[in-house]
Amino acid sequence: RLHARLTEGGAEVRQAAKGDAGTLGGLRWDILWPVPGGSEMQTGNPGSVTIEFDGRGIRSVFLGDLGEDAQVALDRVSAPGRVDVVKVAHHGSRDQSPQFYAELHATVGLISVGADNGYGHPTASLLDMLRSVGTLAVRTDRQGLSVVAPAAAGGGALTVWTEKGG
């Protein structure tokens, strides 16, 4: 229904895919996944839009709900490389690629997850994996709204502000 309402209102609605890019204020954004056409274009979690932002002193990648297989495929066709911030895939489920996160080598890993969810997210294995690659886990269930910004001192350092502290 939303799609129909948007198009009726004159909005152009299309599926995002690798190669789409633009700017938003001082940020450059690039769609890394899914790949248009071919076998890499999928639906559901494996087809989650993955977007990279770069600007204002921070490089980040948002992984949607990509599971391990899709993360490996993304790495093969459009490796993001090192980033400052990663929005951890699929609420921190166990379906993650340790090698992919090691290659990201993010300073901060944002985990969007509901408190007391029945899925056990984020999983202990995901949290251990982030710890092992030096990524600070910042969780919405425990810390609430979180903001990451370049530190005033510069030098690539980041400042993390959380609604609930911790």
Model-derived regions: residue spans:
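Non-globular, low-confidence helical/coil segments that flank catalytic cores
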Residues: 1-166
